[in-house]
Design a protein with these regions (language model features):
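ATP-binding N-lobe of GHMP and related small-molecule kinases
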Residues: 1-102, 120, 124, 128-129, ...
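ATP-dependent small-molecule kinase catalytic core of the GHMP/sugar-kinase superfamily
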Residues: 3-11, 19-21, 25-32, 124-194
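Gly/Ser-rich oxyanion-binding loop with an adjacent helix/lid
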Residues: 82, 86-159
Length: 194
């Protein structure tokens, strides 16, 4: 039995959707989708450390990500702590390299990394299938990142995944607009009218 770590570091990779079909909005507010996720080498870095007391703190470098309580890594950490009843706090240090609100899944990847990290800090009491349920509650991209798959076909709310073998490594060029925007607004343009 290996000892429970007091801190660890996880790379939280970006992704691209090689295709994306946004379907009808469901009663829960999420859209059904069909997509092909592909993991990229570009990654944020998440450090998680146990601390005395309770609660989750977040320190971010590299980009502004908004209020800590809205951050998916903080929400994910709280899900694991609440779900296990472990009476310790967590300090998260996030180094952002994935452009914020770019559609590359940075926040979702950070959330998946936090689920894995905090579960490890607690001695891995949450089984994989429950972590996937937590991931699905956080967002449509989070289950893919938690799965560890390099390539996956996803549908439903992103929680249904078919793992595929990785594509051959190839250089690529990804262009992002100079002026940031809200990628979620693009999703509303892709939904077919009722």
């Amino acid at each position: 039995v290996s000892p429970v770590p007091v801190s660890l570091r996880i790379s939280a990779h970006a992704k691209v959707n090689l295709f994306l079909r946004v379907l009808a909005r469901e009663d829960d507010g999420f859209h059904s989708l069909e997509t092909l996720f592909c993991l990229l080498s570009l990654a944020d870095e998440l450090e998680a450390e146990r601390m005395e007391g309770a609660g989750v703190t977040l320190e971010v470098s590299g980009a502004e990500t908004g209020p800590a309580q809205d951050n998916l890594a903080v929400r994910a950490a709280n899900m694991v702590l609440d779900g296990t009843g472990h009476p310790f706090g967590v300090r998260l240090k996030l180094t952002k390299r994935i452009p914020v609100r770019s559609g590359l899944g940075g926040g979702s990847s950070d959330g998946a990394a936090a689920l894995l990290a905090v579960n490890a800090l607690a001695g891995n009491p949450v089984p994989r299938h429950e972590l996937l349920q937590f991931a699905a509650r956080l967002g449509s991209d989070v289950p893919f990142f938690l799965s560890g798959a390099p390539l996956a076909l996803a549908w439903g709310h992103g929680e249904r995944l078919l793992r595929l073998p990785p594509l051959p490594a190839a250089p690529g060029l990804l262009l992002l607009p100079v002026r940031g925007g809200d990628i979620t607004a693009l999703g509303t343009l892709m939904v077919p009218p009722p």
